[in-house]
Every structure is written in structure tokens, then in C-alpha cells.
Swiss-Prot record:
Matching HAMAP family: UPF0756 (MF_01874)
Membrane-spanning residues: 14-34, 51-71, 86-106, 121-141
Recorded topology in the membrane: Multi-pass membrane protein
Main location: membrane
Subcellular location: Cell membrane
Domain of life: Bacteria
Organism: Escherichia coli O139:H28 (strain E24377A / ETEC)
Keywords (A to Z) from UniProt: Cell membrane, Membrane, Transmembrane, Transmembrane helix
Listed InterPro entries: UPF0756_TM
Protein name in UniProt: UPF0756 membrane protein YeaL
GO cellular component, one term: plasma membrane
Length: 148
């Protein structure tokens, strides 16, 4: 039996490797392994909880320098005194807001996920871009097409 979905996933994984987007490639390969093994019974759970777990892991990674002491409290305090740091804080707020819109959009219009993924891979491959989070990209899309 020919599995079109598996072929699409393999193609996207290949694009991920070609564009040096190992995060995308490895993520897709993990999903392929889940798909072709008895682990496929976990797909409903992955679909329901995967995004939340991913955001938790991402937040842990972002907060680790504060928790480990690599980013000392004095640096955090000084960030409120420097205009460049204030700009960085404002941009961080905007990007977080966009990410929230992206979560909403991806939940209400999951068909856009493939387009976001292909667009990211093409941007990396053709324009020497850097793979950015699909949540932020989805947030930008939501500004154009709306949340629903």
C-alpha cells in the first residue's frame, strides 16, 4: 500500500536537511518513526499536547541562563536602563504576542502548518535565511489573514 502522507513527510524531512534546518528534519523523522511503529497510537495525545509541551521545553531553554546564574541579576536590572535593552524588551513582548496569535491560528487552521514549514525551508534554502519559530510565522500570517 502506498502511503502518500509518509512520502510527504519524507520530502519535508529531506528539505529540512537540504536547508540545514535540522530541527525540522529531526522533528519530522521522529514523527515518521511514530507513524510506522506501534507508537502511532500516541498521535491523538501528541496532537493535543505536543504544542504545549514544546512551548514548555522552549521556555525552559530560554530561562535556563537565569536559573543557572549565567545571566546574573545585575544584567537583568541593567536591561531596564539601556535604550537598546528596552527596544529588545519591546520586541520580545511583540514577538510573544505574535506567537500567541500563531498558536491560535495553527489550532484553528492547521492546514497552514505545511505552508509555514515549506516557506521556512525555502527561505533558509534560497535566501540564506535562518529558521525561525513557526509560531511567530503563524502570528504574522494571522495579521494578514485573520485568526479564524
Amino acid at each position: 500500500m502506498f502511503d502518500v502522507t509518509l512520502l510527504i513527510l519524507l520530502g519535508l524531512a529531506a528539505l529540512g536537511f537540504i536547508s540545514h534546518n535540522t530541527t525540522v528534519a529531526v522533528s519530522i523523522l521522529v514523527l515518521i518513526i511514530v507513524r510506522v511503529t506501534p507508537l502511532s497510537t500516541f498521535f491523538p495525545w501528541i496532537e493535543k499536547q505536543g504544542l504545549s509541551i514544546g512551548i514548555i521545553i522552549l521556555t525552559i531553554g530560554v530561562m535556563a541562563p537565569i536559573a543557572s546564574g549565567t545571566l546574573p541579576p545585575s544584567t537583568l536590572i541593567h536591561s531596564f536602563l539601556n535604550w537598546k535593552s528596552l527596544v529588545a524588551i519591546a520586541v520580545g513582548v511583540i514577538v510573544s504576542w505574535l506567537g500567541g496569535r500563531g498558536v491560535t491560528l495553527m489550532g484553528s487552521q492547521p492546514q497552514l502548518v505545511a505552508g509555514l514549514l515549506v516557506g521556512t525551508v525555502l527561505g533558509v534554502a534560497l535566501f540564506r535565511g535562518v529558521p525561525v519559530g513557526p509560531l511567530i510565522a503563524a502570528g504574522l500570517v494571522s495579521l494578514i489573514v485573520g485568526k479564524q
